[in-house]
């Protein structure tokens, strides 16, 4: 019997993508060794606010720079093409239908794991995919047996921290890869 291929999806606003995102991607990629690894930028996430929202084409460019840095990954633009608010269930149902011969893994953080009961059609979603819970808080994360827990070093970096530092004219080097730092500075993103 042939093994199904493994596809990992890493969703987020990536506004901007930063070093902690790269750490998550790298750790999950090397632990699961998937056939494909997709970054899945959201158009608008249902449980987030949308201040300082950078247009998708700029976020895509930064993800491409991050992929060059990592040496793996592709961008799945299904949510961007759909526009409007995206529910993970709808997105992943479409991906599962297009990838019938694959096991789909979806990365979320412990903060999202604790909110899963609020997710749209969560029980149906759990039947479609395997959640990969990335844990930054403790050494071991108790997760449902149908899920995978991946521990990574804690790194207190957020996209909002980076946007605020840019706005306040503080340095962001080290918080984002050099190529993304240069792109943000050249384009003047998040300055006001």
Swiss-Prot record:
EC number: 2.7.7.18
Superkingdom field: Bacteria
Catalytic activity as recorded in UniProt: nicotinate beta-D-ribonucleotide + ATP + H(+) = deamido-NAD(+) + diphosphate
Keyword annotations of the record: ATP-binding, NAD, Nucleotide-binding, Nucleotidyltransferase, Pyridine nucleotide biosynthesis, Transferase
Involved pathway(s): Cofactor biosynthesis; NAD(+) biosynthesis; deamido-NAD(+) from nicotinate D-ribonucleotide: step 1/1
InterPro entries assigned: Cyt_trans-like, NadD/NMNAT, Rossmann-like_a/b/a_fold
SUPFAM superfamilies: Nucleotidylyl transferase (SSF52374)
CDD domains (UniProt xref): NMNAT (cd02165)
Class of the enzyme per the UniProt entry, highest EC level: transferase
GO MF, one annotated term: nicotinate-nucleotide adenylyltransferase activity
Matching Pfam families: CTP_transf_like
Gene Ontology process terms (BP): NAD biosynthetic process
Role summary: Catalyzes the reversible adenylation of nicotinate mononucleotide (NaMN) to nicotinic acid adenine dinucleotide (NaAD).
NCBIfam families reported for this sequence: nicotinate (nicotinamide) nucleotide adenylyltransferase, PRK00071.1-3, PRK00071.1-4
Recorded family membership: Belongs to the NadD family.
Protein name per UniProt: Probable nicotinate-nucleotide adenylyltransferase
Organism: Staphylococcus haemolyticus (strain JCSC1435)
């Amino acid at each position: 019997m042939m093994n199904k291929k493994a596809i990992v999806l890493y969703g987020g606003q990536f506004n901007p993508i930063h070093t902690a995102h790269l750490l998550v991607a790298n750790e999950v990629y090397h632990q699961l060794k998937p056939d494909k690894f997709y970054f899945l930028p959201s158009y608008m996430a249902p449980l987030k606010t949308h201040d300082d929202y950078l247009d998708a084409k700029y976020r895509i460019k930064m993800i491409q720079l991050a992929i060059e840095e990592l040496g793996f990954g592709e961008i799945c633009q299904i949510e961007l093409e759909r526009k409007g608010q995206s529910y993970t269930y709808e997105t992943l149902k479409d991906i599962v239908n297009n990838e019938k011969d694959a096991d789909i893994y979806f990365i979320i953080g412990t903060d999202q794991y604790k909110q899963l009961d609020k997710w749209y059609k969560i029980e149906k979603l759990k039947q479609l995919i395997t959640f990969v819970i990335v844990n930054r808080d403790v050494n071991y994360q108790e997760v449902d047996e149908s899920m995978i827990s991946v521990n990574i070093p804690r790194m207190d970096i957020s996209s909002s921290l980076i946007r605020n530092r840019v706005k306040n004219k503080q340095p962001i080097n080290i918080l984002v890869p050099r190529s993304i730092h240069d792109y943000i500075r050249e384009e003047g993103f998040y300055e006001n």
